């Protein structure tokens, strides 16, 4: 079982894809890491030797900020924006889109599920 930065990599996937399970490592960065460490990207995670796993772990920990450190850094940046009172910080705090998107319609991902407001009731028809 390959474990890097506290994350178990899926055994049946290729190493190239398995590394993307680490927060902060995407496909291109994964390919870069494998090229630098000399590990074949087509190798399955279960077939990695202990030495290869140790090399990957050492290279990633020395050259990249991943998982908890990256999440903490991101949260601190958002908190800093909110503390200095920027528009972006306010939008983060309110849970609204930060980058200028419209909110009259759409923005469901940021705003959450719809909250239906009862409309005006229809008057009974006269017959």
Curated annotation (Swiss-Prot):
Ranges of biased composition (kind: Basic residues): 101-127
GO biological process: translation
Disordered, as annotated region: 90-127
Family annotation (InterPro entries): Rbsml_uS13_C (IPR027437), Ribosomal_uS13 (IPR001892), Ribosomal_uS13-like_H2TH (IPR010979), Ribosomal_uS13_bac-type (IPR019980), Ribosomal_uS13_CS (IPR018269)
Origin: domain of life: Bacteria
Record-stated family: Belongs to the universal ribosomal protein uS13 family.
Protein name as annotated: Small ribosomal subunit protein uS13
Annotated organism of origin: Rippkaea orientalis (strain PCC 8801 / RF-1) (Cyanothece sp. (strain PCC 8801))
